[in-house]
């Protein structure tokens, strides 16, 4: 039904129009603009819903780069505008030009799953909620990815990333359990790396910090701390320009698309994995943790390492728990 008329038109360089605001928020008054029912009806008659439906399948199965575009377009299924329809055609044109650039897996890719996550603070001007996304790669290519909008309003970018880390952790745990049930426990013998580009969110997850910035966060999101203590995941800080999940949070420029797209779909190697914050130099790469003694004792218990008791209280506690 939709035809891409290339002609002399230049092919789009990004999956969603860069710096193109399709929200109904007036930039000056910050008020929501009224809905034009006549315009919406005309756009629906053009086949806007069919357009979005046709983009959802490739987004979910073969072309993760258009996930953010589908997430944005899906928010206007009832009352679309001409600008929204134009953005959808832009995405369709980009997909056509890159139809041969799907997901790639390689035998020399990462043998253990790796998760990258990101969020864009207050990306939605109407609700002040942030968009977030994550991708889990295995054997070089993405096997789980998502681009959504937070259901809660974050007060800072660190809080948004902390909530995103928790959402991504749920899928990581599902994958770890699946691999164990399939008979591949060696693939999840080590904690799964969770790579994000916000240092504060990474620190909240790794350390037992209660600050003015995170004390109000709902308890559900602090589940991530338990996963770190149990040695199931290991958050690490990655450079923002190397975070492939950035394409799930906002409309990126053509330069960012050119840099991240091949890494996201598995056609290019992942960025260099940062050094673990728990490992000190000079110990042959062994895990030497810098957190509090209780945290260390719990980690050693998970790894079946004899704990180093430094006080009678710790000995009594370990005896009571059967360590």
What is each PLM-predicted segment?
Residues 1-323:
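Long, low-complexity, charge-biased intrinsically disordered regions
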């Amino acid at each position: 039904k939709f035809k891409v008329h290339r002609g002399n038109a230049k092919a789009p360089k990004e999956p969603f129009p860069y710096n193109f605001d399709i929200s109904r928020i007036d930039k000056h008054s910050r008020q929501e603009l009224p809905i034009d029912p006549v315009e919406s009806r005309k756009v629906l008659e053009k086949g806007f819903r069919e357009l979005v439906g046709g983009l959802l399948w490739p987004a979910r199965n073969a072309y993760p780069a258009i996930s953010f575009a589908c997430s944005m377009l899906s928010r206007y299924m009832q009352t679309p505008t001409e600008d929204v329809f134009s953005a959808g055609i832009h995405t369709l044109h980009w997909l056509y030009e890159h139809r041969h650039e799907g997901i790639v897996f390689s035998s020399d890719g990462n043998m253990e799953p790796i998760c990258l996550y990101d969020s864009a603070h207050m990306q939605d001007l109407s609700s002040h909620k942030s968009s977030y996304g994550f991708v889990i790669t295995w054997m070089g290519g993405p096997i789980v990815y998502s681009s959504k909008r937070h259901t809660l309003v974050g007060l800072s970018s660190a809080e948004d990333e902390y909530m995103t880390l928790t959402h991504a952790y749920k899928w990581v745990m599902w994958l770890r359990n699946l691999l164990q049930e399939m008979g591949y426990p060696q693939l999840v013998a080590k904690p799964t790396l969770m790579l994000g580009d916000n240092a504060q969110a990474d620190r909240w997850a790794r350390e037992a910090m209660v600050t003015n910035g995170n004390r109000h966060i709902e308890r559900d999101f602090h589940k991530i701390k338990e996963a770190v203590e149990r040695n199931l995941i290991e958050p690490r800080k990655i450079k923002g320009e190397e975070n492939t999940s950035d394409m799930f949070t906002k409309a990126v420029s053509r330069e960012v698309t050119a840099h991240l797209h091949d890494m996201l779909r598995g056609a290019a190697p992942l960025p260099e994995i940062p050094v673990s914050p728990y490992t000190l130099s000079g110990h042959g790469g062994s895990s030497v943790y810098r957190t509090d003694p209780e945290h260390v004792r719990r980690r050693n218990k998970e790894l079946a390492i004899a704990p180093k008791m430094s006080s009678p209280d710790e000995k009594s506690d370990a005896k009571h728990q059967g360590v």
